[in-house]
């Protein structure tokens, strides 16, 4: 069962509607018990990193999420600030992230003195530098992915 983590920050109904439209059943998870039957997770989020982490920590779901993802190995997809929360920390705040992906989330600024337009928006190809569980099945070199983000 796909569970969309509802910790008070995010566009939960948009995800439920999208998945329903493509024929996939998903449910909202508001409590740790709601996560018991999760076989996949979506962690949405809108807004500031610290606010989102604060709300998740207050929700009481943090320990259950850690167990489901780290011990049980269920797949999780973070969207917007939900994806940023998977990291150790963010330069946008001081509250620690989930630390499921080691690293610090940073805002795009410039590369070699060239200021980058923000947000980074549009269709681009990916060129993975190393083998990743995310891309274990691979994809064709011509595959395009849509990006809309200001952080990496």
Locate the predicted segments by residue.
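N-terminal beta1-alpha1 ligand-phosphate binding loop
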Residues: 2-24
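Short glycine-/small-residue-rich Rossmann-like dinucleotide-binding loops
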Residues: 9, 45-47
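Short gly/ser/thr-rich secondary-structure transition/capping motifs
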Residues: 21-28, 59-60, 125-130
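Structural signature of beta-strand start/N-cap positions in the alpha/beta core
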Residues: 25, 40, 75-77
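Short acidic low-complexity segments
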Residues: 27-37
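Amide-donor transfer/coupling interface in amidating biosynthetic enzymes
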Residues: 35, 70-71, 103-152
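Short acidic/histidine-rich motifs immediately flanking catalytic phosphotransfer sites
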Residues: 35-45
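Cysteine-nucleophile active-site neighborhood
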Residues: 47-121
């Amino acid at each position: 069962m796909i569970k969309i983590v509802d910790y008070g920050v995010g566009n939960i109904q948009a995800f439920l509607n999208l998945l329903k439209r493509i024929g996939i059943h998903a449910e909202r998870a508001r409590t740790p018990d709601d996560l018991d039957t999760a076989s996949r997770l979506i962690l949405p989020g809108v807004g500031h990193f610290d606010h989102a982490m604060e709300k998740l920590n207050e929700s009481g779901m943090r320990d259950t999420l850690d167990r489901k993802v780290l011990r049980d190995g269920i797949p999780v997809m973070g969207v917007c600030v939900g994806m940023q929360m998977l990291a150790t920390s963010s330069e946008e705040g001081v509250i620690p992230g989930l630390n499921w992906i080691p690293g610090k989330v940073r805002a795009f600024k410039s590369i070699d003195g060239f200021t980058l337009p923000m947000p980074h928006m549009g269709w681009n190809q990916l060129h993975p530098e190393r083998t990743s569980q995310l891309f274990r099945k691979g994809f064709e070199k011509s595959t395009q992915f849509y990006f809309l983000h200001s952080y990496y």
